[in-house]
Amino acid sequence: MKTLTCSLRRLGAALAAAVLAVCLSLPAMASAPLVRDDYGLFDGDTLSELEAGAEEAADGHDCDVYFLTVDSIGDEDQRAYAKNYYRDNDLGSGSDRSGILFMIALGSRKYVTITYGGGVTAFTNYRIEQIEDEVVPMLSDGDYADAAQTYIDLCADTLDFYAENGEPLDYDNDP
């Protein structure tokens, strides 16, 4: 009986340790950030606000909204760089990794918007041009936080339109 009691105590301690280990690892399993400031433009509060906006924009749409700042991409084509970044960092929502990513390389002054998975359907070339037409002048003026927020807001509007109308926002149905 004494041996059984000791064995049960050891088993209980082992289970408690396992549960604790799983609980401690949960933050590491949290979703990856949607606003990725590799350049270091934004202070902590701004980054938190932008992240909350991007999460809200993507919520319920199975399409993540990413805003990425980097220093320089050298001579690499910005579209190739952004697509490689997207794939290499396992970005996107769901099995088809749906999303949209706006990247600006501040050192080289290059930018691009790419879509992936369901983001390709939700964001037409027409709509991407509209978004860039709003965002890029703000970037040129150095209004980086406003540019990021505008991008996130326009992506949210686009995803909402797609969800409500069953078709993407395009030149023939733009309100």
Predicted ranges, named:
Residues 2-175:
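A structural boundary signal for the start of the first folded domain, especially the loop/turn
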